[in-house]
Curated annotation (Swiss-Prot):
GO terms for biological process: cell wall macromolecule catabolic process; cell wall organization; peptidoglycan metabolic process. It is a lipid-anchor. Keywords: Cell outer membrane, Cell wall biogenesis/degradation, Lipoprotein, Lyase, Membrane, Palmitate, Signal. This is Membrane-bound lytic murein transglycosylase C. A lipid is attached at C16 (N-palmitoyl cysteine). A lipid is attached at C16 (S-diacylglycerol cysteine). It comes from Haemophilus influenzae (strain ATCC 51907 / DSM 11121 / KW20 / Rd).
């Protein structure tokens, strides 16, 4: 697990250090900076190992917000998948109080935030977690007064301790999110989703289903494969295709993709490319939707090769099948277990959003 999490750091650290260089050749730059990345990764890992001990490395991911503060002695972890917030420190309770307030009032703008530095995330007048967490009195946490009072309550009434393997003592609080926290986050992005859906002719429920599966509507999302933001757009693959479609050179930067409007537009643009270019020959709309979902995860080429190595023959075979057959093959025969499960998850999520519309 630790090795996997370290791999997740590599592309993110690289992307952060080059976020202003749109149009950069990703492959050449990545190879060129490998030594520097090893140093950065080693430093981060060393800090966490030294302070927290073995098997304690937590880093930001697709559905997890993780932020270290106080020279890495305090950290906040928001699990957008499980709907739980854990804030813990090895320092005094004032540090814990401060971390609780800053976490509850952090904004939705990930563009200028370095999740791998140890500074506080700025307090926002429009907290991203607003409506997803309530305090001990059932109030929404909308400002610093409410957040501070709730932090005091948590420390006085809900404080827990645990012992690390290195002998250090950690004090922490755990805060559950409300039951429908996923839907609350989804609603924040509905105007942008509807705009992109209308512009590119893509079903809103499909966009919502993909976004939930990719990031659980976490605007800070980052993956080990360098997929960024709400729709987990990979700059040097899907991002490059989208820029080419728009007549732009190069690829989107990390900063560009951490803007929710840009990210949703890029993700839906890529769905349009899959629908109208790479998978254009598939005639049944349901079969095409299944192929698009699978291709969003594994690529159109990988999807077509499940049916035949020749693209035209693969499309012909798909067109001879019922949609249910296409679905069964993509969820059982596709060589990637991730892709097989991805179609199952997105299809289920899309159906849920169709019902709720």
């Amino acid at each position: 697990m630790k090795k996997y999490l370290l791999l997740a750091l590599l592309p993110f650290l690289y992307a952060c250090s080059n976020s202003s260089n749109q149009g950069i050749n990703y492959d050449e730059a990545f190879a060129k900076d490998t030594q520097g990345l090893d140093i950065l990764t080693g430093q981060f890992s060393h800090n966490i190992d030294r302070i927290w001990g073995v098997n304690e490395l937590l880093v930001a991911s697709r559905k997890d917000y993780v932020k270290y503060t106080d020279s890495f002695y305090t950290r906040s972890h928001v699990s957008f998948d499980e709907g739980n917030i854990v804030i813990e420190t090895q320092q005094d309770l004032n540090r814990l109080h401060n971390a609780i307030v800053h976490t509850l009032l952090m904004g939705a703008d990930a563009k200028g935030i370095d999740l791998f530095a140890s500074g506080d995330v700025p307090i926002s007048s429009r907290p991203f977690l607003l409506g997803q967490v309530v305090d001990h009195q059932g109030q929404h946490i909308a400002n610093q007064v409410i957040a501070s009072n709730f932090a005091t309550y948590l420390i006085q009434n809900k404080l827990q301790t645990r012992r690390l393997q290195n002998g250090h003592t950690v004090q922490f609080v755990s805060v559950p999110m409300i039951a429908n926290h996923v839907e609350v986050r989804a609603r924040k992005y509905l105007p942008l989703i509807r705009k992109a859906a209308q512009r590119y002719g893509i079903d809103e429920s499909l966009i919502l289903g993909i976004m939930q599966t990719e990031s659980s509507f976490n605007p800070y999302a980052i993956s080990y494969a360098n997929a960024i933001g709400l729709m987990q757009v990979v700059p040097h693959t899907a991002g490059r295709d989208v820029f080419a479609m728009k007549g732009k050179g190069g690829q989107p930067s990390t900063r560009y993709l951490y803007d929710p409007a840009n990210n949703i537009d890029a993700g839906v643009s890529y769905l349009w490319i899959l629908q109208n270019q790479y998978l254009d020959g598939i005639t049944n709309p349901t079969s095409k939707r299944f192929a698009m979902i699978s291709a969003y995860n594994s690529g159109a080429g990988a999807v077509l090769r499940v049916f035949d190595n020749d693209k035209d023959t693969a499309i012909y075979k798909i067109n001879q099948m019922y949609p249910e057959q296409v679905y069964r093959i993509l969820t059982t025969v596709h060589p990637s277990s991730q892709a097989r499960n991805y179609l199952l998850k997105v299809d289920k999520a899309q159906k849920k959003f169709r019902v709720r519309r």
